[in-house]
Amino acid sequence: QFEAGSPVAVILASGDLTLGGVGTITRREGDRILAFGHPMLGSGSVELPIGSAEIVDVVSSYQTSFKLSNIGEVAGTLWQDSTPGIQGELGRIPYMIPISINSNAGIQNPISGKIAEHRQLTPSMALVYAAQAILTSKEGPDGSTIQGSMKLSLEDHEAPLELKRSGVGFGGAIDILFSFAEVVDLVLNGSQEFPRIAGIQFNFQTENREMSQILHSLRLSSARIQPGESVQLTITTRDRSGKAILHEVEVPLPPAPAGSSFTLFVADANALRSYDGIAKNDPSRPL
């Protein structure tokens, strides 16, 4: 084990879901190993887990042959990922982020494990882990309404960051997953600092019926608002049966001098998704 010619794994996720890349050890000196003969991701200096691996079979292909393998426990740290190969040290275990997913419709519940700490990989691994619960539910996401929440705990922060999203069907499930991954990415890459995530918790509640509504009409209490006042909105939506539902919404306005103008954007999910796709790179779009 961990000798020249034996397999080694770079572990991106462990626990109920295991993900990683497997290659061959080129050389070992003491607790240090050189492996792969090519980069894993080409990330340079990193702190990723490495562990044992077992090659089950080699699948031959004219296009790209590949190995079927099992990944074992974390046993060390990959600290250099460059063009000649990867370098790691056995015995030094890197930090991994605890993750758990609860779902009322999951085939397995809860799902828990750990994911690698990495600016680019952590958001993707969190998305993949959460997808195991939301996309592999007993009934599947099609025709269902999904309520999703994410709790992101940071070291040195008492209160966790909490986010809630809702969606209908497969498209709604994908929107929820990517919106959560975007927040994780923003936390890790939104500044020069690299905050340590102490844990990620997901919760998904699925109902086997579509609870979607479309926006039918909107009425403002007044188009002219005094400083410090709020905008009163009466919104009418309709469900799938055509039944009208009234919503009274109060929107506070930020302090501004007299004569200022504001743009308020109100949309249902389909319109908002289209609007985001068109105006994503427009800095002047209304909030």
Locations of regions flagged by a protein language model:
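Terminal presequence/propeptide segments associated with secretion/organelle targeting
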Residues: 1-287
